[in-house]
Amino acid sequence: DKLAKEMDDLNMGYLINLSGSGFGPQSAKDLYFNQSMKNIKENQPERFGLFVNVDFESIDDVNYGETQANIIKDAVAKGAIGLKIYKSLGLRNKDSSGNRIAVDDPRLDPIWDICGKLGVPVLIHSADPFQFWLKKDNKNERWFELKEKPNRYYAESSFIPPFQEIIQEQHNIFKKHPKTTFINAHLGWMANDLE
């Protein structure tokens, strides 16, 4: 009730929890999601929505795509209204061989397909601001952030590919899955370049 009152004070009608599954092993994600959904349904379901999240750590499992699609199906049946993909996909997530999992990795296709079939959107956050790949100097508008958080500087990374490669991987899934609604978080990091 306190949160709903604060929302009223802000003239906010609806709030979506994008991290509806939380983090950790799948059993913990399932528990967190179920508790969150129960809380919403028992309180103010007309004011709150929940997105589900998927696991990339098990991508090498034989039935990975089917398993994740079933998790999404189950979550939507329970009331999830979308899928949130964190920026770690394409940046930091690795398969069991230590290889970067690309945003357009075909093992992920069942995830995008089921969201299209179920009619739920995929809010996908790919890469980071492109300035994190530029030279750290007075012409980089994020120089201070990079000074304060040097782990965000990717230009010299041997693991993280160039910004444009990650964004292209994202655009590849948009093209490959036309029946799926994708929401490109942060305008694909190009809000200041709308050409």
Q: Which residues fall in each region the model found?
A:
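Mid-domain alpha/beta scaffold segments of enzyme catalytic cores
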Residues: D1-L118
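Catalytic pocket-lining loop regions of alpha/beta-barrel enzymes
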Residues: I101-E195
